[in-house]
Amino acid sequence: MCHAREASPGTGEPEAAPRDNFPRAAGSKRGVGAAFETRAQRFLERAGLALVARNVTVRGGEIDLVMRERDGTLVFVEVRARANSRYGGAAASIGVRKRMRLLLAAHAFWARTGGANACRFDVVAFEGGRLVWLRDAFRADDAG
C-alpha cells in the first residue's frame, strides 16, 4: 500500500490533557467521539501536521483523521478514548479487526489521492487525564 518512510522517532510520551477528559456536554457517544477527534486534530496541528480530511468512510472502514506531515507523508489517525486503563487502555483497544478496517479505508483513500505519498498509521489515545500520541503505531504488513 503506502511506501513507508523511515519513521522519525516518536517519544510516545504522554502530553498534558485536561483532567476532565470526558466532556459531559457532548451528550451522545458520537458527540463525545467528535469532541475527542477535534482535540486530537488541534494537538496534531500544533505539532505541525495539516488536516487533509475527517471521518473518511468507505465501505467496511472509517478513518477518524487524515493529516499530512510537512514532508508530504499522509498520516492516518485513529482516535481512542478510555476513562481509565483498567481494560488495557485506549490504544490496546485497537484489535486486528479494527486495524484491518483502518487499512481498507486508508488504502481506498490513498489510491483515490494518487497513491504516491508515503504514509503511516498513528493513534492518539486519551487515557485518564493524558493524551498519548503513538506515531507509527502499526504498519500495513503487521495488521493481520
Curated annotation (Swiss-Prot):
InterPro entries from the UniProt entry = Restrct_endonuc-II-like, tRNA_endonuc-like_dom_sf, UPF0102_YraN-like
Q: Which GO terms describe its molecular function?
A: nucleic acid binding
Pfam annotation, one family: UPF0102
Q: Where is this region: Disordered?
A: 1-28
| Source species, domain of life | Bacteria
- Gene3D superfamilies given in the database record: 3.40.1350.10
Q: Which HAMAP family match?
A: UPF0102
Family listed: Belongs to the UPF0102 family.
NCBIfam families linked to this entry: PRK12497.1-3, YraN family protein
This one is known as UPF0102 protein BMA2801
Native organism is Burkholderia mallei (strain ATCC 23344)
**What lineage does the source organism belong to?**
Bacteria, Pseudomonadati, Pseudomonadota, Betaproteobacteria, Burkholderiales
